[in-house]
């Protein structure tokens, strides 16, 4: 019985760590302070989805991905 309980605890911890998102994903969308128009993707933590936005080209934050696939792999 103790072994079964230990296995359950280990499994629970592994699931918890595997489902933890990168802190980058909690950053807000930041279009940057310049005036270029690069199509990018960011993770919207309110909707739980990656969404497109236009990046100005400088500034911003790390919640800024070149492709939808890259955003989903990191955050979704």
Swiss-Prot record:
Q: Where in the cell is it found?
A: Secreted
The answer to whether keyword ATP-binding applies is no
InterPro entries tied to this protein: Kunitz_BPTI, Kunitz_BPTI_sf, Prtase_inh_Kunz-CS, TFPI/VKTCI-like
Q: GO CC annotations?
A: extracellular space
What is the reported tissue distribution? Expressed in salivary glands.
| Any one GO molecular-function label of the UniProt entry | serine-type endopeptidase inhibitor activity
The alphabetical list of record keywords is:
Blood coagulation cascade inhibiting toxin, Disulfide bond, Hemostasis impairing toxin, Protease inhibitor, Secreted, Serine protease inhibitor, Signal, Toxin
Please state the span of the N-terminal signal peptide per the UniProt entry.
Answer: 1-20
Per the record, the major location class is: secreted
Enumerate the spans annotated as BPTI/Kunitz inhibitor domain. 25-75
> What is this protein's function?
Potent anticoagulant protein that inhibits the hydrolytic activities of all serine proteases tested (trypsin, thrombin, elastase, and chymotrypsin), with the highest efficacy on thrombin.
Q: What is this protein called?
A: Tabkunin 2
From which lineage does this chain's organism come? Answer: Eukaryota, Metazoa, Ecdysozoa, Arthropoda, Hexapoda
């Amino acid at each position: 019985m103790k072994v079964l309980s230990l296995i359950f605890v280990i499994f629970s911890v592994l699931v918890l760590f595997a489902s933890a998102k990168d802190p980058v994903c909690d950053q807000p969308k930041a279009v940057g302070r310049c005036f270029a128009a690069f199509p990018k993707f960011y993770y919207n933590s309110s909707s739980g989805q990656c969404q497109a936005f236009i990046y100005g080209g400088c500034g911003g934050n790390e919640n800024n991905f070149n492709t939808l696939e890259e955003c989903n792999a990191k955050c979704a």
